Amino acid sequence: MLACPAQAYTKDPETGVVWIDQNKCIGCGYCTWACPYDVPQEEPNGTVSKCHFCRERVEGGKGIPYCVEACPTGALAFGWTKGGSSPDYLAPPDITRPNLVVIPPREGKVQASPIKVKSEKNYWELVAFTLLSEVGLLYSLASLFLKLHFAPLILLLTFAAGLLPSVVHARMTNRFHRVFLNLKSSWLSREVGSGGLTILLALISLVIPTLFPVAVIFAAVSVASSIMVYMLRARPSWYDADTPISFIGTGVTTVLPVAAFLSGSRLLLPLAAVVLAAELYSFYNRRRKLTLYVKLGNYRLLSALAMVVDLLSILFLPLAIAGSLISLASEVLHRLNFFKFVTYYGLPNDTQPSVRSKQETQSISKV
């Protein structure tokens, strides 16, 4: 509920049942990222739906969910419960605190893992927006302290080129205006809202330059919100220190060498090298933790090469451009793999295998 930018989720205060208003859903799919139980599902019509426990029957005491009524073994129950359980084959319950009780089998143990692997769909616009916004922000920040030209125009172009195509990521584009409705709790609303204001203020600052620092502030808010959008506990491969380090590092490692070349400030080059070293450390630390699930390549070695080139640029400044381009290549590959190899919490099943083999066992679930 808190993640939905369009306020399409509603919770019944009496029964606790949560459902999605199909007339409000914009189809961005962010709730499918945030849920660790595979409950929200994308529909062919562009919206997202979820089980709502047949709320038309539950409301007013007209009946119980059809699945509970139809289950021939009585394995399902619906009603008020006290306490809960956290079996190791489900996601940690403190992520969403679900009203779910799972009774494990009396004998044996369920051999399954809730961690699964997949590739995110339609992620090119997300790659473009995150990379371009980070580069635009850092160039604009640097321009406040160094003699860098065309900063308002670059900020406008990078955010517009990144944000506008990302509109299509919300499949119900005719309702995209709803993405701004949940600024109170949705990082996605904050990301898009502040990004939109950045574009507007950058455009105005072409005529009124004094507004440019305000545009930079909103750009910083947008990038910070972008980081938080992906810091989801339901997705362990994203919920990692490498995410903020790489998102911030993208701008630093690609922009500072260029800024050093344009301004003649060689002191920026060691700073870029330090950030590259931090990116290398965070990447290989993340890679080590994900080895069980996915095999990430050694493309981040490009960052090591960029670090060497940046340091050599202190002696021969034109090399800084090469260092920036090498860093950009490393960042693009890293961001592509960020979306291509995703580990997430879900329900172990046969259609999307979990990372550990499962054993056929019986369990009883009470909802």
What is each PLM-predicted segment?
Residues 24, 32-126:
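Flanking helices and flexible, charged tails adjoining ferredoxin-like Fe-S electron-transfer domains
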Residues 82-83, 88, 322-326, 341-346:
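Composition- and surface-driven signal marking solvent-exposed, interaction-prone regions
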Residues 15, 114-120, 141, 177, ...:
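Membrane-interfacial helix termini and the short, flexible loops that connect transmembrane helices
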Residues 150-201:
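Membrane helical hairpin/interfacial module
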Residues 120, 130-135, 145-150, 185-186, ...:
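Long, contiguous internal "core" modules enriched in hydrophobic/ aromatic residues
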Residues 170-173, 333-348:
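Juxtamembrane/interface segments at transmembrane-helix termini
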Residues 1-18, 22-34:
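Ferredoxin-type iron-sulfur electron-transfer modules and their immediate structural context
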Residues 94-99, 103-149, 153-156, 340-344, ...:
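N-terminal signal-anchor module of multipass membrane proteins
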